[in-house]
């Protein structure tokens, strides 16, 4: 049985290698990077995972790169410093309009949609010992961690909390660092915006008792009045100590590709990711919604021609006017 399994694996690897060698790689890069975010967040795990899948299937070297998150990824992909990246619809829209704080006035229109990822919910986490169980419980002047500077959380969560009347001191850092600061009493709460389950939150609840602070329905409505978000529920069981479903708001995340990359390269890369959903689920549970039918969640970016070709071959109806170069 072991010999049969070994032979099957060898044959499968040989077939994958042969398929990669048979591809027309004219104009393809020799290697690539995927702009992710800080360690401890979903972007780093998800992005490094999808980089590995593309590298394996296409037979070229590639990997995830630690970055400042969606805003920086838009800049890196726009300039071509990173072939691929990950962003949310809010930062993507700001970047297209020239209001990305990394390069104010520059319209980053060379970052194209590649495939849908997942929704990023916004939630606050505090130590149980803090007594913070709701947004209204957050004391004035609280020190709140918002993730890396330029991340989706840092870009939107402070303004969201301000709209709810929360007075706070803003702190930035990687999710892992902020988790340590929370445990050391240097922070009162962390405002997370990341795909769930978030590794840093899972690690935090394994080490100490935490409160998951949800929004009230009124707070959800208030936030939706001023921000490009939708209601979201973090399902019970996402985290081990979660008391039940958690009300939240969320933004969609999309993988992006430099618009000038060869169509055939991005087509094959998209096929590698979207063609085997089970493999992406092994990368991260957030990939549950990385499925073809969510192509229409891109409401901002032009599609890369290679990605659009794959999606239109697999049930999408992406209008030619929304494809880069048309």
Question: Predicted segment positions?
Answer:
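Short, low-complexity disordered leader/linker segments with a strong preference
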Residues: 1-29, 325-326
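Pocket-lining segment of extracytoplasmic ligand-binding domains
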Residues: 89-91, 98-104, 130, 166-261
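N-terminal (or domain-start) structured segment
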Residues: 23-94
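An extracytoplasmic/periplasmic, membrane-proximal ligand-sensing/linker region
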Residues: 29-30, 177, 184, 194, ...
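Extracytoplasmic
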Residues: 29, 41, 59, 69-72, ...
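Short beta-strand-centered segments that line the small-molecule binding cleft or hinge
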Residues: 93-99, 110-116
């Amino acid at each position: 049985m072991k010999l049969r399994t070994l032979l099957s694996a060898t044959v499968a690897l040989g077939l994958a290698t042969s398929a990669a060698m048979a591809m027309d790689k004219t104009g393809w890069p020799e290697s690539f990077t995927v702009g992710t975010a800080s360690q401890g967040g979903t972007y780093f795990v998800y992005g490094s995972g999808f980089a590995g899948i593309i590298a394996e299937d296409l037979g070229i070297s590639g990997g995830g790169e630690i970055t400042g998150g969606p805003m920086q990824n838009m800049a890196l992909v726009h300039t071509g410093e990173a072939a691929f990246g990950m962003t949310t619809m809010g930062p993507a829209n700001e970047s297209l309009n020239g209001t990305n704080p990394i390069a104010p006035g520059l319209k980053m229109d060379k970052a194209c949609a590649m495939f849908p990822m997942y929704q990023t919910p916004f939630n606050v986490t505090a130590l149980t010992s803090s007594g913070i169980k709701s947004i209204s419980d957050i004391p004035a002047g609280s020190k709140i961690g918002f993730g890396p500077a330029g991340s989706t959380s840092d870009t939107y969560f402070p303004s969201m909390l301000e709209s709810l009347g929360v007075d706070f001191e803003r702190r930035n850092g990687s999710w892992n660092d902020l988790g340590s600061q929370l445990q050391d009493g240097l922070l009162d709460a962390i405002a997370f915006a990341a795909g769930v389950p978030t590794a840093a939150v899972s690690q935090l609840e394994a080490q100490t008792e935490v409160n998951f602070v949800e929004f009230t329905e009124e707070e959800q409505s208030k936030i939706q009045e001023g921000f490009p978000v939708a209601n979201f529920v973090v399902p019970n069981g996402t985290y081990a100590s979660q008391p039940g479903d958690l009300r939240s708001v969320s933004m969609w995340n999309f993988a992006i590709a430099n618009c000038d990359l060869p169509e055939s390269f991005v087509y094959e890369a998209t096929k590698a990711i979207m063609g085997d959903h089970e493999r992406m689920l092994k990368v991260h549970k957030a990939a549950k919604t990385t499925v073809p039918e969510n192509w229409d969640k891109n409401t901002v970016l032009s599609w890369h021609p290679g990605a659009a070709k794959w999606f239109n071959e697999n049930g999408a109806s992406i209008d030619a006017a929304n494809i880069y170069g048309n």
